[in-house]
Amino acid sequence: MKQQYSLAHLTVLGCPPPEMTYIAARAGYDFISPRFIYMGLPGEPNYEVARNPQLLRETKRALKSTGVRVHDIELARILDDVDPRSYLPALEAAAELGARAVLSSIWTPRREYAIEKFGELCDLARQFKLTVDLEAVPVAAVVTLADAVDVLRKADRDNAGLMIDTHHFHRALDRPEALDALPRKWFHFAQICDAQREIPADRAEMTRIMRGERLYLGEGGIDVGAILSRLPHMVYSLEVPHLARVRELGYAEHAFRCLESARSYVAAHAVRRKVQRATIAA
């Protein structure tokens, strides 16, 4: 089965969705994962197509002309005092553009409250035939794989999923074998990248790397292959923000190199796995 790839918006954050789509098409991606929910972070553009009819039209035009599709949208955060209904316009726009999923993360330490609101988000997304895929983030309130699993089990929604980001997984000191016991139906896509093996002790430094210095696959110290080998076949979203490389190469070339390195790494890892299985069988 052909491996499909999506271009995550954080990789090319300065590009509006139409430009992102054209870049993805030229590089050879199958999908885009746009950030249609504005988070209000310093220096981060607002790409809310639900509130910008012209941007929505231009995005539709780009998708139609290139054949690239929307895989998932970002980022429905569960914050203190969040009203999940505030995400309805983005969910509707996502469905209109053919998306399959909405990515979510939890930033409130109030676990029971977070579970309740995550469940409400899942219920809202269900009417648009969207899954809600939770990621553990090392600087958020749900940090580890165990944290995310706890939320999913207690929320108990049939359209809830678990999104593994290889950077976050490594930073949380999670073990790949822990993925074996989890329901396969939870896994819809993964975000993949590499990064330095050393885990920053400082939150600010971890955030800086997370948002602006991730590495091409095979370039850093994360055993990405060990993580992917525990997951079912799925779309890989390439979230590889690197501010210095973007300044040097431009968004288009950086996105292309992200995909080329991922394809090479995944292909080489698949060959190694076949050799290992053959050796064990012999």
Where are these regions (language model features)?
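A short acidic, helix-capping loop that chelates divalent metal ions and anchors anionic groups
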Residues: G40-N46, L79, A172, A244-E248
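Active-site acidic/histidine proton-transfer and metal-coordination neighborhood
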Residues: A62-R69, L75-L162, R171, H269-Q276
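Histidine-acidic metal/acid-base catalytic patches
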Residues: M1-S6, L13-F31, K64, A93-G98, ...
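Active-site beta-loop-alpha junctions enriched in small/polar residues
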Residues: A8-V12, R35-M39, L75-I78, I106-P109, ...
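Alpha-helix N-cap and loop-to-helix initiation/capping positions
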Residues: P16, Y47-L55, V82-P89, P109-E116, ...
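Short coil/turn segments at secondary-structure junctions
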Residues: G43, V102-S105, E135, R211, ...
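Glycine-rich, proline-tolerant flexible connector loops at the mouths of alpha/beta enzymes
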Residues: S33-E58
